[in-house]
């Protein structure tokens, strides 16, 4: 087994909720991360926008709080998801979420 684990904090810019045909609750958020990191002894501005998918009953207690402007920390794994336009994009499937605001 190989490692696929990511922890990222940021601000929710969009969110939506739905249930799958099997009745599983899903929340989908767009997470915006801004920070500064050192790379090769130089300070670098870091900016990321990435979709995060939260699935199943363990997230139902926080789903009402996942709204634009809320700061969160997400821990999960990354995978490719194919959009309706056929383009692949990287997304995070959350295993844990912590509200920061």
Swiss-Prot record:
Stored InterPro entries: NA-bd_OB-fold, Primosome_PriB/ssb, Prisomal_replication_PriB
**GO BP: any one term:** DNA replication, synthesis of primer
Domain SSB, first and last residues per copy: 1-101
Tell me which UniProt keywords the record has, alphabetically. DNA replication, DNA-binding, Primosome
Gene3D superfamilies in alphabetical order: Nucleic acid-binding proteins
Gene Ontology MF: a single term? single-stranded DNA binding
Family matches, as SUPFAM superfamilies: Nucleic acid-binding proteins (SSF50249)
GO cellular component terms, semicolon-separated: primosome complex
Under Pfam families, the record lists: SSB_1
Q: State the protein's purpose.
A: Involved in the restart of stalled replication forks, which reloads the replicative helicase on sites other than the origin of replication; the PriA-PriB pathway is the major replication restart pathway. During primosome assembly it facilitates complex formation between PriA and DnaT on DNA; stabilizes PriA on DNA. Stimulates the DNA unwinding activity of PriA helicase.
- Give the quaternary structure: Homodimer. Interacts with PriA and DnaT. Component of the replication restart primosome. Primosome assembly occurs via a 'hand-off' mechanism. PriA binds to replication forks, subsequently PriB then DnaT bind; DnaT then displaces ssDNA to generate the helicase loading substrate.
What family is this? Belongs to the PriB family.
**Protein name per the record:** Replication restart protein PriB
Question: What is the phylogenetic placement of the source species in the record?
Answer: Bacteria, Pseudomonadati, Pseudomonadota, Gammaproteobacteria, Alteromonadales
């Amino acid at each position: 087994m190989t490692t696929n684990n990511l922890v990222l904090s940021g601000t929710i810019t969009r969110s939506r909720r739905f249930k799958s045909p099997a009745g599983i609750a899903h929340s989908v958020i767009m997470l915006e991360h801004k920070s500064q990191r050192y790379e090769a002894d130089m300070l670098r501005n870091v900016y990321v926008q990435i979709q995060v998918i939260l699935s199943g009953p363990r997230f139902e207690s926080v789903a009402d709080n996942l709204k634009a402007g809320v700061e969160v920390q997400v821990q999960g794994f990354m995978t490719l998801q194919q959009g309706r336009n056929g383009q692949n994009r990287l997304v995070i499937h959350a295993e844990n979420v912590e509200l920061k605001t």
